[in-house]
Amino acid sequence: MNTETFFVTGNNAYTILEVLLDNEFLWDKAQYKCYYGYYINGKTNKVIAFDNRTGHCNTEEFETVEQAKEWLGYEDK
């Protein structure tokens, strides 16, 4: 199964993620591809991590990218 990670920053980040998750076609595609990753909310400067690898989308808000990466299980290589 393909896994894709994408990163979005800027003021439109939340809107972009909403479009991805609210659009039925894209949501189906996201479930199929198991999207996960994080983006910076340009309005609050919070880091939002999202993980759909379990079949439904889990999201958490963090202060730092490092916290988001830890939640997602990234390993620095």
Question: How would you describe each model-predicted region?
Answer:
Residues T3-A13:
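N-terminal non-globular leader segments, chiefly Sec-dependent signal peptides
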Residues T5-F6, E18, E24, G73:
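Glycine-centered secondary-structure boundary/capping sites
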Residues Y14-E66:
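Acidic, low-complexity, intrinsically disordered interaction modules
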Residues M1-E4, E66, E70-K77:
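Short intrinsically disordered terminal tails
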